[in-house]
Amino acid sequence: MADDNNNGATNPTLSILAQYTKDLSFENPGAPRSLQARDKAPTININVNVNANPLSDTDFDVVLSLNAEAKDDDKTVFHTELVYGGVFRVAGFPQEHMLPVLFIECPRMLFPFARQIIADVTRNGGFPPLMIDPIDFTQMFAQRVAEEQARAKVQAVPN
């Protein structure tokens, strides 16, 4: 007979049920001139956002949004936007761990796929592939929590 040391508690599980591209766009407004050799590399700005919505008690839709814009001085060289999602089954985690799982672990699992899509679309647009550096989702989550706490404090102060 096996020993049952978990006292009826279930082991935490995190699994991807589906992954999908919700929105993808690439704009090359200066083509074909933008494809010519240039003296300096364009400035690239990347914005990242993560959202999660419950689908059921255990299933969540987690969406990673990546927005990249390359500029040469004030002219847009290219602009790409990707909204990449995953349906995750998250079960057995204590309630206090749910937000970190949804906003850190789930996007960490989605990121390599989203990064590859961005690299492919920029390459297919005539540019070198844009290889986005790894993202620190833990730091992003901590910043988001701090901003929400600061916002709650401001709203709690009577006028």
UniProtKB/Swiss-Prot annotation:
Gene Ontology CC: one annotated term: cytoplasm
Broad class of the protein's primary localization: cytoplasm
Keyword Ribonucleoprotein carried by entry: no
Pfam families, sorted: SecB
Localization of this protein: Cytoplasm
Domain of life of the native organism: Bacteria
GO biological process terms on file: protein folding; protein tetramerization; protein transport
One MF term in the entry's GO annotations: unfolded protein binding
Keyword entries, A-Z: Chaperone, Cytoplasm, Protein transport, Translocation, Transport
KW Hydrolase (keyword) present: no
UniProt xrefs under PANTHER family: PROTEIN-EXPORT PROTEIN SECB (PTHR36918:SF1), PTHR36918
Subunit structure: Homotetramer, a dimer of dimers. One homotetramer interacts with 1 SecA dimer.
Its biological purpose: One of the proteins required for the normal export of preproteins out of the cell cytoplasm. It is a molecular chaperone that binds to a subset of precursor proteins, maintaining them in a translocation-competent state. It also specifically binds to its receptor SecA.
Family per similarity comment: Belongs to the SecB family.
Protein name listed in UniProt: Protein-export protein SecB
Species of origin: Rhizobium etli (strain CIAT 652)
Chain's gene name: secB
